[in-house]
Amino acid sequence: MASRTVSGSDNPTRSRWGLVIAAVLVQLALGAVYAWSVFNKPLQDQFHWSKAQVVLPFEVAVGTIFIGSIIGGRVQDRVGPRPVALGGGVLYALGMMLASLVSSRSQLWLLVLGYGVLGGIGLGAAYITPIAMLAKWFPDKRGLITGVAVAGFGFGAVITAPVAKWLLATLPRKTEVFLPLGLAYLVAILLGASFFRDPPPGYRVPGFVPPTTGRAAAGSRAYTLNEALRTPQWYELTAILALSVACGIAFISQAADAAQSIAHVSAGTAATLVGVLGLFNAGGRVFWAWLSDRIGRMTAFVDMLVLQALCFLALPHARSLVLFFVLGALVYLAYGGAFGTMPATAADYFGTSHAGAVYGAMIVAWSIGGVIGPTVTALLYERTHSYTLPFTVLAIVALVAVALPVVTRMPSEPAPYRTGATPVARH
């Protein structure tokens, strides 16, 4: 069959740029999960849960994201992005609504089940879908566009936090906040995901010739998940993401407390600071993804990790609010950059035909890093009552991680083993 050229401009309502807007809308709703810290104190005050108990729903949500991303990625590659995003969105919103039913201290399990398990799995399925879809639609701007998509996730908490604070101040039972939020998430995801679709067979961007050497891959590889798992590169990329996430989310989990301890600011100032820093998380996803299109993916990861390491070494000595803010902003910027750059990197290395399954499986790095990083940092702080040791350890981890992008190389095409498979063209 002859290749079909689709520029995406024949119908503006179904153009590839329209898909970017739809993807950002979905990611905004999903990124609201990072606003959990807003719920901590109101829930503690009303239900008398401990600190460890009140953060459990969020930890479970982060820990189960990879389940949804693996399942959703595999299913998406078979049935397309729309049903997976819609299904994930419904599960995510249903989890929020279930959490709104919690009415007593003994029902923490229901909050964990709704917000944590159902919400986390639904989030994972809906999160991976627009990333894999846009990687197929934008081979010419793969880094930038996937960065823009996941930037929506970063902005989700920034938008949700003030709304949630207002609702918490007006509702007598604090868990009721999850009902209107869940309904809002559902509407946003259903609206955005209803436009999702994969490009038609033979799709190509007029005038774009995939590079075969240099900084980007040709993208003509067609690795299945099983084939990708047989390469060391899949594990190298997953490790890069896991270590970067562990360092970044460890700081995010302690940012407000660290600002009060190191820079001696008030709790209110620290809360405002964390809200502003969230903008750099979102901005980093776009900036580093865009930059990686120009300087190369691995060079970008080296720069991100070195930047994190230097900031962690300096943070314990940041006695002024301005210096703490600048260093914290750079950490947030690098943390967001890992999420913005890795989807395009995975597509470069393993192609876009099975991008949902391949990158979906890599999301296990998010769950691993998101649990280990904050846990180790909190334990080290409890032992020393200082952030010097925790942040020094994070700096060492980031510096050690630099070795991974330095040694990681493109995989060779796998020998096809599927029945009726044809060899992947080599360039």
Model-based region annotation:
Residues 43, 124-138, 146, 337-350:
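Intracellular juxtamembrane helix-capping segments at the cytosolic ends
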Residues 183-214, 401-409:
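C-terminal membrane-cytosol helix-exit motif in multi-pass small-molecule transporters
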Residues 237, 247-250, 269, 274-345:
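C-terminal transmembrane helical hairpin of 12-TM major facilitator-type secondary transporters
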Residues 36-41, 226-290, 373:
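Extracytoplasmic gate region of multi-pass secondary transporters
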Residues 108-124, 242, 323-336:
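Hydrophobic core of transmembrane alpha-helices in multi-pass small-molecule transporters
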Residues 68-81, 285-296, 381-382:
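Helix-to-loop junctions at the C-terminal end of transmembrane segments
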